[in-house]
Amino acid sequence: MKCTGVLQLSAAKKRQKTIISSCYHEGALKVSRPIYLEKDLPFLYLIHVGGGYVDGDVYLTNLDVEEEAELAVTTQSATKVYKTPKKPVVQQTNIHLKKGSVLEYLLDPLISYKGARFIQETTVHIEEDSGFFYSDVITPGWAEDGSLFPYDWIRSKLKVYKKDRLVLFDHLRLEPDEDMSGMLQMDGYTHIGTFLIFHQKADKTFLDRLYDEMEAFDSDVRFGMTSLPASGIILRILARSTGIIENMISRAHSFARRELLGKNGVTWRKY
């Protein structure tokens, strides 16, 4: 399968500091130079050099975080998927976390416009004592008729393996031809967000405290969370605006950083 963009990147710890040990990219995918907003932790910005994803695009990203290394990754801006009359856009991401490593992978929202079809497949392999923070936000794009869900469909599959055992399979399927406003769908909301944590300290006590932190959020929003096998927690959010979901995920991320990593919240410095 010919790819529109490819990114392969590895991070390793050297002299008490994480460095980017190898990096290869081609096509429409680029990556910024590492920015050390924290002394030992490189922050990377994934960059798409085109105006958005279009018909038949295929993107492949491979990230490897070596033993005891720490890496934070985000995007430069939202991912925009435009009309796909012939073939859906496909985005595949493969992540490997070695023993004791930490990856914070928090991307900007996905915006799907009228006629868009999008397949997202993310596979994560986690080794012992590693930590993984992940977010995903899906929002409807603008349509000239004012419809709330102009895209054709979205398929998002997230698989997490710990020691080669499948501990999470999250399959999110959104198809506006169905009643998206009904129960077991979006329940009257338009935007959906996910925040995922895997960390050895993410136990029931942490889950309860995180719930209290989220419950204090005063806005028109619905959310739920549950524990997962192998010290994991998943948070799902429904809202009517991107900003509300981003604020909730930011709060959850800051709380998790403080409680699990002993670090302050992070400002990604996007303008």
Curated annotation (Swiss-Prot):
Keywords per UniProt: Chaperone, Cytoplasm, Nickel insertion
Keyword ATP-binding: no
UniProt KW Cytoplasm keyword: yes
InterPro entries in UniProt: UreD
Subunit architecture: UreD, UreF and UreG form a complex that acts as a GTP-hydrolysis-dependent molecular chaperone, activating the urease apoprotein by helping to assemble the nickel containing metallocenter of UreC. The UreE protein probably delivers the nickel.
Free-text function comment from the UniProt entry: Required for maturation of urease via the functional incorporation of the urease nickel metallocenter.
Protein name: Urease accessory protein UreD
Protein species of origin: Bacillus sp. (strain TB-90)
